[in-house]
Amino acid sequence: MASIVFSTIGNPKGYQKVTYEIDGEKFESNVSVLALRDLLKVDKTVVILGISVADVYNCKYADYRSCKECIIQNSKNDLGISESYVVAPNVYQKFKGKPDHYFTYIYYHSLRILEKEGINEVFIDTTHGINYMGVLAKEAIQLAVSAYAAKSEKEVKVSLYNSDPVGKDVSDTVKLHEIEAIKISPLSGLKYVTYQILNKDKNFFNKIFSDSVNAIPRFATALDNGLFIYLSEKDSSLHLKRLEDDLSKDPLLTPSENEINVVYKDMKYALSHALFYVISRFSGNVDLDTLRHYAETYADKVTRAIIENEVDKIEKYQMGSERKLLGEYMKVEGKGFDKRILYAHGGLPYAGTYVYKEKDKVYVTYGDKIDEIERQI
């Protein structure tokens, strides 16, 4: 089981060596993350710094990447940590920008690390973060873990650590405490992502891409309500690719006489990426076994029971290779359906869902009814 600790650091040169303690075990270090790594036997370490640390090391501001590399190389020497570093755009003194750019950067780059390392357990250490760093880093990493757990169908444990308050001169041991511990399942990860989106003002997602103000809440609603056929058939891969392209670029660093402007992407890009990242789990033709698996993994108890009941009904009929509406088998009259019917049947309205058999598997599809389905979401 692979584990990782993400730790926010304000000034890599600003911490004295102390003795940290966790559950009676002690470790001497200038930063808490080394104690956590050693005492909790964590596999991987990621240090999160702000770009404003460039002033600590007199780094040149030619561009973000070279400035970032200067910070990393110097920080490795001061912290004694040679592993991964994330240098995020932050607001501090002459560095100007928006705090949520810090959030978005950490979300995207921590997600990439989780994917690469195949992580099952995450520790977040906010002991040395300054200003908003600890809070936003924790929220960004939780969003990344939620999206990662959902798409990869993993349960991931997340633990938050911080220390007792300390002054400049520390003579006693400093205790590190587990402030919070939760388990994020594929379902709870999915729900966390959709909650972040569906509770925002509608105009929050304006101008990300064409019609994003309507499309993003609609996709989030479909995901939240278990409309797995819609998610599989309504191609959203271009939205994900555009967001990947935007978020993978370095922030823009623009020095002037008295300040340095740092520009990246707003929080809405992180939330939108998390949504389409999870949705990318659903693609291709959906057979009944696949639909049942989606319901078992990603649907709440009520939606799961509805979908499984509808699948059980469909399995009783002898299907052919010709696509026919479910209503023809169910002997249900009427050609239309509304929002109530769509959700009451777990996304399988009899007048809007085709079924057919191919190579011993029964498939369900919206076919030419998908636009009508979309209008009801």
Swiss-Prot record:
<dbReference type="InterPro" id="IPR052875">
    <property type="entry name" value="CRISPR_assoc_ribonuclease"/>
</dbReference>
<dbReference type="Pfam" id="PF09455">
    <property type="entry name" value="Csx1_HEPN"/>
</dbReference>
<comment type="function">
    <text>Activated by cyclic tetraadenylate (cA4) to endonucleolytically degrade linear RNA; when cA4 levels decrease the RNase activity of Csx1 is abrogated.</text>
</comment>
<dbReference type="InterPro" id="IPR053857">
    <property type="entry name" value="Csx1_CARF"/>
</dbReference>
<keyword id="KW-0378">Hydrolase</keyword>
<keyword id="KW-0051">Antiviral defense</keyword>
<keyword id="KW-0540">Nuclease</keyword>
<comment type="similarity">
    <text>Belongs to the CRISPR-associated Csx1 family.</text>
</comment>
<dbReference type="GO" id="GO:0004519">
    <property type="term" value="F:endonuclease activity"/>
</dbReference>
<dbReference type="Pfam" id="PF22230">
    <property type="entry name" value="Csx1_CARF"/>
</dbReference>
<dbReference type="GO" id="GO:0051607">
    <property type="term" value="P:defense response to virus"/>
</dbReference>
<dbReference type="InterPro" id="IPR027419">
    <property type="entry name" value="CRISPR-assoc_Csx1_C"/>
</dbReference>
<protein>
    <recommendedName>
        <fullName>CRISPR system endoribonuclease Csx1</fullName>
        <ecNumber>3.1.-.-</ecNumber>
    </recommendedName>
</protein>
<dbReference type="InterPro" id="IPR010171">
    <property type="entry name" value="CRISPR_Csx1"/>
</dbReference>
<comment type="function">
    <text>CRISPR (clustered regularly interspaced short palindromic repeat) is an adaptive immune system that provides protection against mobile genetic elements (viruses, transposable elements and conjugative plasmids). CRISPR clusters contain spacers, sequences complementary to antecedent mobile elements, and target invading nucleic acids. CRISPR clusters are transcribed and processed into CRISPR RNA (crRNA).</text>
</comment>
<keyword id="KW-0255">Endonuclease</keyword>
<comment type="subunit">
    <text>Homodimer.</text>
</comment>
<dbReference type="InterPro" id="IPR019016">
    <property type="entry name" value="Csx1-like_HEPN"/>
</dbReference>
<dbReference type="InterPro" id="IPR013383">
    <property type="entry name" value="CRISPR-assoc_prot_DxTHG_CS"/>
</dbReference>
